[in-house]
Amino acid sequence: MANVSIRKYKTSDYETARFLFAEGTKEHLPAACMYTLTTPRFYFITFVAFTSVFMGTGSYVLALTSLVALLAAGWYGLYSEFHGLASRFLRKDMLDIEKSYMMSENACFWVAEIDGKVVGTVGAQPSTDADDELLLQRISVARDYRQLRIGTKLCQTVIDFARQRGFNAVCLETANIQRAATNLYERVGFKKSRVEILPSLVHQYTSFTVAYYRYNIKS
């Protein structure tokens, strides 16, 4: 079995850490598309679109063309959402990882390494909502290494850090389409605290939800 080591971020990890996070975010696009295709709202909208065009034109070809256009617009909307999300974070805390995570005693960034190769990342920062909570974020594991329990090790690293720094809980958020991530967090011991539908048009159309999880640290 591969020897996985978790260590603190170094400046030389910069490009790899950003790449892993961005790719991990964008790869949720297929799952998002499949999820959207199963929602009642999708069937309702496509039915209304097809029926309206057919009733207005009497043409099956135009009605089907309208469905293709609707699907293309939906795909582009999801594509823009996930690629835009990755870009926004790359321009925020991931733009200067050293400054965002390594210059405060209550924040940190780690990488998972196998044979000198960085294959995973995770960051932790104090919550802006509560002084006793630490946020787990920017967790990502390279696709070819996801059967090695690296995600579990990264989560546990953040939990241990929070305990050492005197925090009472570790919190995080994840989308409902991220099934593997949700299973990981629940397996580690995180408990779901609430679920929200974000106000953006894409989230309203697709019924995507964001779940908030909390891990209470025992004293």
From Swiss-Prot:
This is Probable N-acetyltransferase camello. Belongs to the camello family. GO terms for biological process: gastrulation with mouth forming second; negative regulation of cell adhesion. The chain crosses the membrane at residues 44-64, 66-86. GO terms for molecular function: N-acetyltransferase activity. The lineage of its organism: Eukaryota, Metazoa, Chordata, Craniata, Vertebrata. Plays a role in regulation of gastrulation, possibly by controlled reduction of cell adhesion in the periblastopore region which is necessary for optimal cell motility. It is found in: Golgi apparatus membrane. PANTHER family: GNAT FAMILY N-ACETYLTRANSFERASE (PTHR13947), N-ACETYLTRANSFERASE CAMELLO-RELATED (PTHR13947:SF55). Residues 62-211 form the N-acetyltransferase domain. Pfam families: Acetyltransf_1. InterPro entries: Acyl_CoA_acyltransferase, GNAT_dom, NAT_camello-type. Keywords: Acyltransferase, Developmental protein, Gastrulation, Golgi apparatus, Membrane, Transferase, Transmembrane, Transmembrane helix. It is a multi-pass membrane protein. One of its GO terms (cellular component) is Golgi membrane. Signal peptide: none annotated.
